[in-house]
Amino acid sequence: MSSPRAEESPLNVLVTGGSGASGVAVARALNHAGCRVFTVGSDRQRIEAAAQQAGDGVTPLVCDLARLDDVRRLREDVSAAAGPVDAVIHLVGGWRGATGIPDQSDEDWDFLHQGAVTTLRNVSRVFFDDIAASANGRFAMVSSTALDQPAAGVASYVAAKAAAEAWTMAMADGFRKADGGQAAAVVLVVKALVDEGLRRRNPERSFPGATDVEELAAAVVRLFKAPADELNGARLRLAGQPPQ
């Protein structure tokens, strides 16, 4: 696969939340597409293992994305090693649920808010100018179809995701106003994500409607092949598996 950028130097792409199956798949696909990939996680052993799975040339980095100063140091490290970041694929999240509204716990809310909102705010504030200045700047987050019809049992989850989506749409407005208008902020929407490991551990389940992490990865690569003005502010639904 050819590089999404036709220029001599490859795109510098940061995959945040890179330790899981989706992070591995996205980093691998971007690496194969010719990007210079930095995959970020909070646990050194896990992110190094993920980078190894993603392939030669993928660089693992450790950062607590909930801490703004740590994210600023992350930018300094990447910039020193490879120059400005062109794109961030934000895969940090998490899920918590309850039975209804009364038992939505503060602990679950704090967990979801930190994972879905705080990390995204920090990463976007620190890397916004770099992405906006790139000729192929992209920012993408993954959201959920649960926002279409919010259910009481997942009130905290959908509220956190909605906040993250709103912030991303505000980024899109910022990119429109930036000089050049070459950057795009996008929300990728799935019902759920599934990978081969999850299927092997749960052979009795069919995961109807879930999107394979390889399809997510392919969708991320496609973001660099479409014009920014067509993508910016888009909420793109990814296909899931049909019921079996």
Model regions: which residues?
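Conserved glycine-rich cofactor-binding loop
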Residues: 19-20
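Conserved glycine-rich Rossmann-like NAD(P)H-binding loop of the short-chain dehydrogenase/reductase
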Residues: 33-49
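Rossmann-fold cofactor-recognition segment
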Residues: 54-69
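Conserved mid-core segment of classical short-chain dehydrogenase/reductases
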Residues: 72, 93-110, 153-156
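Amphipathic alpha-helical dimer-interface segment in Rossmann-like NAD(P)H-dependent oxidoreductases
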Residues: 76, 80, 114-135, 172-173, ...
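Catalytic Tyr-X3-Lys loop
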Residues: 102-121, 140, 164
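Catalytic loop of short-chain dehydrogenase/reductase
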Residues: 132-179
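C-terminal helical subdomain
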Residues: 182-189, 195-196, 203-244
